[in-house]
Amino acid sequence: MCHHTRSPEAPTENDRRAFLRGVAAATTVGLGATAGCLGDDPEPAQTEPPAPVSLGGGKACDACGMVIADHGGPSGQVFYAGDHPSDRDGPAWYDSLAELVIERDAAVDRDREPVGTYVTDYAAVDYEIRETGGDRIISSHVAPDTFVRWDEAVYAVETGVVGAMGPDLLPFSDRGAAESFVEAEGGRLVEADAVTADLVSSL
């Protein structure tokens, strides 16, 4: 897949950090406003998560509004029990995993139950890294079979390879592939259960 280049208006590192801080602040402020609207009866738990969907076809990130397939880097999707997102069936979707983590954590704080999270699996695709405007941007992959369950991946961080919103988590379902990536690109590996909003905001 060819890599999409960034336009002159693409987010800078300061823009990215400001955006992520804004997302975190906005979702935190919303907790009190939504808490009283939730029903007392929990949604029944699902034993198997829904299958991932394509993030192509002009789908725009639920956090920043950018068209997911038009930008490089990992993308992700989160299915929730109940009617979230409220404007459509299916998952919430994001063009970066930093946004996904912050939004998912905030949804959990509002008593939303994630029943399936999927992220780009760079061990399952023939990815490219392209230098554009001084950045080394990894390719985007949006077909359903390019996603892996969140907890089945290990994440490369602090690598110097970026995605749609700058530095991001780079998921691999195969640890050997992840270790080879870090050996070539720098950084370190983080397990899924160690990924927090504080971590992604610090990247």
Where are these regions (language model features)?
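Extended, aromatic/histidine-rich regions of cofactor-dependent oxidoreductases associated
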Residues: 2-8, 13, 36, 40-43, ...
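N-terminal secretory signal peptides and thylakoid transit peptides that target proteins
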Residues: 6-33
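C-terminal segment of N-terminal export signals and the immediately downstream linker at the start
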Residues: 13-14, 35-62
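Cys/His-coordinated zinc-binding microdomains
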Residues: 65
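Short functional micro-motifs and their immediate structural scaffolds
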Residues: 69
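Short cysteine/histidine-rich zinc-coordinating motifs and their immediately flanking basic loops
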Residues: 73-80
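Mid-length scaffold segments of soluble, non-membrane domains
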Residues: 90-133
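A short, solvent-exposed beta-edge/loop patch
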Residues: 144-191
